[in-house]
Amino acid sequence: MNIINKILVLFFAIILNTNTAFSAEKWDMALAYGASNFHSANATEFAKNVSDKSGGKLTIVTHPGGSLYKGGEIFRAVRTGQAQIGERFMSALGKED
């Protein structure tokens, strides 16, 4: 194998590995309730299903118990792009525009 072929093989190996590394995406999901609460359990199951159905291209990491944002801050955090996804009762958003 001459030097040009070796360089081409190395180049394509780097490109393929770089593409694979950047194709997976991770989202943080803010949850107000503790991990044992059924809302958080449902969110965890949802996150698992998303990862399975997307073939691992999208992984959602749940943050229960207000560990990422407190309940009253979740809507603002998602709205402003600080968190990609969050769970909050719709009735708590009654005064939001």
Where are these regions (language model features)?
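N-terminal secretory signal peptides that target proteins for export/translocation
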Residues: M1-N5
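Bacterial N-terminal signal peptides
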Residues: K6-T18
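Boundary at the C-terminal end of the N-terminal hydrophobic targeting segment
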Residues: A21-S23
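Short, glycine-/small- and polar/acidic-enriched structural segments
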Residues: K26-D97
